[in-house]
Structure formats: structure tokens, C-alpha cells
From Swiss-Prot:
A Pfam family matched in the record: Cys_Met_Meta_PP
GO CC list: cytoplasm
SUPFAM superfamilies per the UniProt record, alphabetical: PLP-dependent transferases
One Gene Ontology molecular-function label: pyridoxal phosphate binding
GO BP annotations listed: transsulfuration
Gene3D superfamilies: Aspartate Aminotransferase, domain 1 (3.90.1150.10), Type I PLP-dependent aspartate aminotransferase-like (Major domain) (3.40.640.10)
InterPro entries assigned to the protein according to its UniProt record, in alphabetical order: Cys/Met-Metab_PyrdxlP-dep_enz (IPR000277), Cys_met_metab_PP (IPR054542), PyrdxlP-dep_Trfase (IPR015424), PyrdxlP-dep_Trfase_major (IPR015421), PyrdxlP-dep_Trfase_small (IPR015422)
Protein name per Swiss-Prot or TrEMBL: Canavanine gamma-lyase
EC code: 4.4.1.43
Amino acid sequence: MPNPDKHNFSSLSFGTLAVHGGNEIDKTSGAIRTPIVMANSYSLPYDPSTMDWSDTEEPSYTRNSGHNQICLQRKLAAMERGEDAAVFATGVAALHAVFFTFLKSGDHVIVGDVTYEAVWRLFAELLPERYNIEATFVDMGNMDAVRAAVRPKTKLIHTETVANPTTKVADIAALVSIAKDAGALLSVDSTFTPPPFFRPLELGVDLVIHSLTKYINGHGDAMGGVVIGSKKLVHHIKADALVDLGGTISPFNAWLITRGSVTLPLRLKQQFSTAEIVARYLESENRLAFVTYPGLERHDQHHLAKAQFGGKGYGAMMAFAVDGDPDTQNRFVSNLKVITSAVSLGHDETLIVHVGGGGRGGAERYPLNFQKYGHLRLSIGLEDPEDLIADIKNALDLTFA
């Protein structure tokens, strides 16, 4: 390994990269933190006719590229060990950018049968109805089913590393093999499993997508999305889906996410450790109908998760339900005094959201317990585990009093 140099990202360990990546000494002021550059236009050369007006590598117009988004892109590509990255205003914009860039009318896509609601609607309704792009929704825990779904026109396989919200774990190495045999791209939403915990590109995945709003920013105060992969693939995304469609991240959000990502390795260590403690408490609690978390031995993909994630942990997302009807779930949530009832995940504070049994697209493909009770999705934050457990126990006591 070369001597560490903060200007050479490949020479840095992950914690050092998280601190120094995307940060530059400002040449004008001498400030040792990259400033927020709130400009929509940048100075042109003497002869503008020499320019590529769609260039995304040098700042000219912030829809194409700006100083803060370039710094963030370089950092995220290095963190994921990819060649290049394209950042967007939201995670959904990043997902749409992949689909828009690489799919056309008549193409076929294989998608996980449990997936983020926006992805479900895109492939179940919008893309088939408006653009004649057909999708097959498949259990990503069943590789035989994935193979059987492949067609001559299959151009893309898309999955989440850990399904939202059921926590089913996809076998990424097996999917890489299937995609290569099919001549299809494999895109993976790794929002639940950010680096350094897991790097799908190292297994041969073509494109990795993150909602930067979640763990990578980690503070619940900025939105963004990113696609990371080879220079060739990311260039197409920038040229087609960024320059000509927009969805551009603001300089302020790019700066916030660059700053938030500094503490990512420290936050993940705390969140993953706390999640295992909380999950084991939930497993022991007889007032719950079910709990699902990859770190529990009875989870169907526990051994896959242990092997795939290299023993680094099992993430900080879980789902459970109180033994009762929907109003019982709502009463439980209302009795919590530390855990916050809100959407999103990966924040510094622990978040819980109650979703009814039929509350999301494709819910009929959820496990029977999810359909019967609905579910409470729990995103573990940075609080002390004993406080979270006490909060849950007290809320259960009040709910069943």
C-alpha cells in the first residue's frame, strides 16, 4: 500500500478518506474546508466555441456540474471504489437516471418483488404504460426464479441489497453471474448497506445507487442521490439523465452531504452494534407478533448475510409488529418517548414508521405476517441501546395496560 496522501484517495484507509475526501483548501481565502459555491454559472474561456456545452467534468453551468457536486462525486466514487459517480437531487432521481439512460421501448427488466415504493410504481405502472418497458417482479432470494425470468430482451436486473422493508437479503454474487450470462446490466440499491460495510462493485455489479439522504449524509437535513460505476456507464448517465433532464443536487445539499459523510464509519459502527442489541431484545419480547432482522439466526438469509457482509454486521434496519390490530400499532408508536415517528432512515436519531398490511405497492408479495399485522419499520440511530430498549418496553407496557 502506498504511503497515505490525502490528495491520493486510493492511498487512504476508509476512515481517513471519509475525513479528507471531497475537501480542498480554498485558494481564494485559504480556508481549510471546501466552501459552498452558490453559483449557477462559471467563467467561460476566451473562445467559448472550444467548449463542450454538455461537459460534466469542468464547472460551467451547475445543472451539468458545479464545484460542490464534483467534490462530492469524487469522494463517493472513492468510498465505493468505483471509477466515477453522478450525484442527483434525490435517491429517486438517481434511480430514474439509471432506468432512463439504459432502457428503451420494448426492453425487459427484472426487479425485486419487494422494493422501494417509487421503484415499484415506475416498473408496475409508469414505464410499462407510457414507454412499453416490461418488468418481471421476482423473489430476489430465489436464484432459480431470477434465472427463469430472463428473456432475450432483458436489459437490466435491479435489486436492493436488503429489501425495504422486509429485510430479505439478495445474493449479489449470484445475481452478478446471472446478469453476465444474460448480457444485462445489474444495478443495486445499496442504501441500507453503505461503504465500507459493503461494496457491491467489488463483486462485479455494474452500477451502485444510494439515497444520500439516508446513511451517507446521516443527519436528516439534506437530500441527494448517487449512481457509482465505471467511467463509461456513468458518462452516459451524466450526458443523458443529468445534463438533459436535470434532477441536479444543490450546492448546499452537496456540501452538507460531503460534511455528513465525514462521520459515516463511526456512525455505522454505533448503529450496527445498537441494532443487534435492540433486535435481540425484540426477539425475546412476547408481546410482538414478529421481528425480522438479518442478524437474527432465525432470519431466512442470516447465513447469506453473514457471508456476504463479511461479519461486519447486519445493518441497522429491522421490521416488527406488535401483537394486535392497526390501532394497537398506532397506540404503541404514540407511547414512544425517545424514538421518533417519521419516514426516512439512516439518520442520527432512531425513526419508526407504521405501515399497514396493504399500505405499499406490491404488498401482496410481503410475508404473511406483514400482510396480517402491517409492520413497524425501525431505523436505529445513535442513541444508547439501553434507552431505546427502555423506550420500547415502556411503550409496550402502556399499550397493553
